[in-house]
Amino acid sequence: QGNKDNLLKVLDNKNFEIIRHDITFPLFLEIDEIYNLACPASPVHYQNDPVQTIKTCVHGAINMLGLAKRTKAKILQASTSEIYGDPEVHPQQESYKGAVSIDGPRACYDEGKRCAETIFWDYQRQHNIDIKVIRIFNTYGPRMQINDGRVVSNFIVQALENKNITIYGNGLQTRSFCYVDDLIEGIVLMMESKDFAGPVNLGNPVEISVKQLAEEIIELTGSSSKIIFKKLPQDDPKQRCPDISIAKDKLSWTPKINRDIGLKKTIRYFDTLLKS
């Protein structure tokens, strides 16, 4: 989710323009590069409007590819680790085809992103579009929304307010968390790469359980929060960790910011936000 307040510093730049547009409708601009990042990515948000979510994934991809075709622009698709579903291979390599539910509550996002990838490859084959496909794993950092709905923001806000930290399931499910600055570097390197379309995993390969993450955040915030456990949602993956061998080889990319530093930066941001 974006926030216009984050762009206040560049609004006066004559080379910068904000255009508010729903990509489920065609867009007519003259353009050189397209970064297709438009889609709700938190389960709380995409499950609230699953039809719009899958339209954004699929119609959005078609419309942005149509724009790229007309303008001969290079286009990057922000795909997701969720295309691997609840993986049977660990860590996940780009060659893994996934184990994804087609009718569960997460399918609007997971299958929407899978379909978008297919459309990108078809446009490349049929229309020779210059495409780039990245698969983003869990990412966090300053400027996340308070109501983002994912574990890092949820846990930090609950800890700063000394409220119970809610874990869904037993907390043994694992994730790997990439700091936003590292992700942005990977995205830029991918867009600038030559003769490489992807797909490529972009994420931090250091794995952690959700329970351990909660405990780290409690310690870093000095919170009196207690951890409580609730029922695990349907189709929630048991583990998620990227194999980034291709990113290292093709992009010379590897995450640099460790979790302790990244969490401290994110905690400071949310602390300031809550106090304001």
Could you describe each region identified by the protein language model?
Residues 1-139, 181, 265, 269-273:
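N-terminal Rossmann-like NAD(P)+-binding domain of SDR-like oxidoreductases, especially those catalyzing
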Residues 2, 29, 146, 208, ...:
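Residues that form or flank phosphate/diphosphate-binding pockets in enzymes
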Residues 4, 62, 87, 143-145, ...:
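Gly/Ser/Thr-rich beta-alpha loop segments that engage phosphate groups in nucleotides
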Residues 12, 104, 144-148, 206, ...:
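Residue-level signature of the cytosolic catalytic core of signaling kinases
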Residues 21, 138, 157-276:
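C-terminal substrate-binding subdomain of Rossmann-fold SDR/epimerase-dehydratase oxidoreductases
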Residues 54, 144-148, 176-179:
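Nucleotide-sugar-dependent glycosyltransferase donor-binding/catalytic pocket residues
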Residues 77, 126, 144-145, 158, ...:
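Glutamine-centric residue-chemistry signal
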Residues 108, 116, 148, 210, ...:
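Conserved donor sugar-nucleotide recognition element shared by glycan-biosynthetic enzymes
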